[in-house]
Amino acid sequence: MHVVGSIIARLGSKRLPFKNLLPFAGKPLVGLGIEILRATRLVDEIVVSTESELIARVARDFGATVLRRPEALAQDNVPSVPVFQHIVENFPCDVHVNFNINLPLCEPAVVDRAVELAIEKEEALSVPYAAWAQTAHRLRNYGDPWAPEKKAFLFEDSRAGPLDVHTLEDLLEVYRAKQGRIEGW
């Protein structure tokens, strides 16, 4: 069973520019993510998908393989699934797990649990969203990535860490867009 762990890291984040290179716990966020994936039991290969040479250099320094993301997949409005499919096309595997480095306090055990559940159920997503694992078969047959089906097996794990990196402006934008549609807001 070959497991590819990935980090998708754009330099051009509009919400928090250079976010993936900013220091967290003394390391660039992308570097910390690579270290977390390296500490898992089940991830065999670590790939960072990016359009940025700066992020690519840091990723290589931390021992990850870099996959250049085409500009068409490096836009704000592109869902994650096409990016995952691009990774799997270039790095064949049985299971792909993406580590969302917006949640940098995630423990390696959460990533391993997502992989185990994906093997059992084809797709698993941690709550909070730190690890999203899918079998290669599931990714190849995902359907419309712009309107993904809600088939992922959701599992709560306090080791995912409640931290999510955003700006105040970003959070206010989400609040305005969802106002009246989210319970408790």
Model-derived features: positions:
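N-terminal nucleotide-binding beta1-loop-alpha1 segment
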Residues: 1-17
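Conserved acidic residues
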Residues: 3-4, 44, 94, 122-124
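Short beta-strand/turn micro-motifs composed of small residues
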Residues: 9, 50-51, 100
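Short glycine-enriched, charge-decorated loop/helix-capping segments at active-site entrances
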Residues: 19-24, 72-73
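A short, N-terminal amphipathic alpha-helix
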Residues: 29-46
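Short phosphate-binding loop-to-helix
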Residues: 47, 53-97, 105-110
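Short beta-strand scaffold positions
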Residues: 49-50, 165
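Conserved core of the sugar-phosphate nucleotidyltransferase
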Residues: 77-86, 95, 100-185
